[in-house]
Amino acid sequence: MIKKLIHQATTLFVASVIATAALAAETVTVGGKFFTEQYILSEMTTQLLQAHSIPVKQITGMGSSLVRKAQENGEIDLYWEYTGTALIVYNKVTEQLSPKQTYNRVKELDGKKGLVWLKPSNANNTFALAVRKQDVAGNGLHTLSDLADAYRNKKEIKMAGTAEFIGRSDGIKNLQKAYDFRVPRSQLKSMEAGLTYTALKDGLVDVALVYATDGRIAAFDFELLKDDKQFFPSYAVVPVIRKETLEQYPELEVILNQLSVKLDDATMQRLNARVDIDKKSVRTVAAEFLTANNLL
């Protein structure tokens, strides 16, 4: 009888130890969307966690709504999100807010859903309109107000944008209202996102919709027109983590914030260009950046 009790107690103790160890070693799932910048951010995050002996797996190539839903459902623990996307798409807030207000609002709203927004980076992957630098001296375009003046003066300026940009609330329709101009239909070309860059580079259009941290901006020698009326929402990229994951691995806040403060527009442009233009692997680019910044 005593041996039986000892055996049962031993079995329960071993089971408890195994359960505790399994909990302690719970894997952190890092997510990512389906474009270069997100692959890089996801890979850097994964390498950082591995360097700190945190068990991690990576799921990338997901659509924006899918990765968000996966995080809310607990399938993804951590990924890098954009403040404007969270504000407008996920939380349905349409009022115009400053970058700081945008961050504070999504942090508050998502906090109620168990999602923690960590320190925002200075990388703002917002919409922008770009021109070729070689043309600036001749056309005098430096700001969106300059562009609006040119259209009001009936100058022929061909613009390339995506179908989404042409149709959405922070797209061309409200941009025209904010800056008081109109692009003639014949001068507005709708095309897939990647094609706007090549159309501008090849001289098929004069102005093109781009994303501010895209590596092709520097590689193709583009200049971004300053959004002097701050029309476009802030799309600061920020690590977002499930509250329960952060409670289990509180050191993640420091680890991820140390990476976040190293990122700005120029840095992300260079990293993206290393992959898209120089054809380096995402893993190599991530490792080189982390090493160069003493994060590994």
Residue ranges and their predicted role:
Residues T27-E43, T60-S64, E164-G167:
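Extracytoplasmic "Venus flytrap"
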Residues T36-P55, Q71, K173-K177:
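Short, polar/charged alpha-helical segment
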Residues E37, I166-F181, P250-L296:
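An extracytoplasmic/periplasmic, membrane-proximal ligand-sensing/linker region
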Residues T60-S64, G74-L87, T102, A193, ...:
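Beta->alpha turn/N-cap motifs
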Residues Y90-L118, L204, R216-Q230:
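Ligand-binding "clamshell"
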Residues Q101-K158, V261-D265:
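A conserved helix-loop-strand patch within extracytoplasmic ligand-binding domains
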Residues F127-A137, A236-Y249:
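A bilobed periplasmic-binding-protein/Venus flytrap-type ligand-binding module shared by bacterial periplasmic
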Residues K154-D227:
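Ligand-binding pocket segment of bilobal, Venus flytrap-like solute-binding proteins
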